[in-house]
Amino acid sequence: MSKKAFKFNKTLLCVLILAAALLLAGCGGAKSTRAKADETVHTALFDFTCGQASTLEGFGSLEIPEGNKLVQFHMTVTNTSDETYEIFKDDFQMQWGDGDDDFGIAMYPLTTDMFPIETELAPGDSVEGDMMVYVPTDAATLTVAYQEVLGNGNDGNNFFVDLSL
């Protein structure tokens, strides 16, 4: 091999190694995690578990809107960090399709058995309760979504728990 060809191959190899290193460095971004009912999801600050979903025929004096069904599931959140944090029921988005309007939040708690609006959790403490949401009658899956927000305001990892209806 000539000196010129050797230098070219050496330069090409260096460029390829640099490109591979840059590609691998870009792979450290946010990730998505999917789970199913009764599986514990581990975020940076807490663990959460969503129980099996069930469809309710009614609840107290609530009237179920035409074309919808009332879905309930039990949720537990445990602070696994070393600091106290507030947990909000609205931190968890409910999704039931791919459309722009196929999402919502759980209902305002109507009883003490329901997940509270907000709770301050010390390290190791847990909060639990039932979440209820109206979804279209034809929805077959309810997905509970949580998006981490980093200290700099950027989105971190996201987590999805798929519940069969």
How should these model regions be labeled?
Residues 26-165:
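Conserved functional micro-motifs across diverse proteins
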Residues 2, 6-30:
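Sec-dependent N-terminal signal peptides of Gram-positive bacterial secreted proteins and lipoproteins
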